[in-house]
Amino acid sequence: MASQQAFEQSLMDEAYLRENEVGILFGNDSSAKPVIEAARIMDEKHDSALLGSGLIFQSMNSTVTMNLSTIFHLRGINFTVSAACASGSHSIGMTYLLIRQGLQDAVLCGGAQEVNYYSMATFDALAAFSVRMDEPTKASRP
């Protein structure tokens, strides 16, 4: 939905996307749940055929750009940046450089992150979440 809105706000309609080499560059740093699910199936069943042919696409960082480029028929550059929590910001910076150097006229860019129990548990294990959620006025502290 956000990608569609970005194209609409930039006045890039389907004809523009079809006639120009518009690229896509997204930041995405991990995909935990499909990998954990695959490991569970292999541990229990010892049969990779049970994973199915679509599981690989769920576990790749580039799934976001692959799907969006297909949906919008994008023909320009297509890749994913992985830089932990800064992945989305890096994709915007890389897009700026590509356009500034004349390598692309337009690029859909941004960030996407899988949110699920497993990915949140890893951040919780790092003590990255506040234990004082009842004090929202003190949310930003050194």
Predicted segments with their positions:
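Glycine-rich anion/phosphate-binding loops
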Residues: 1
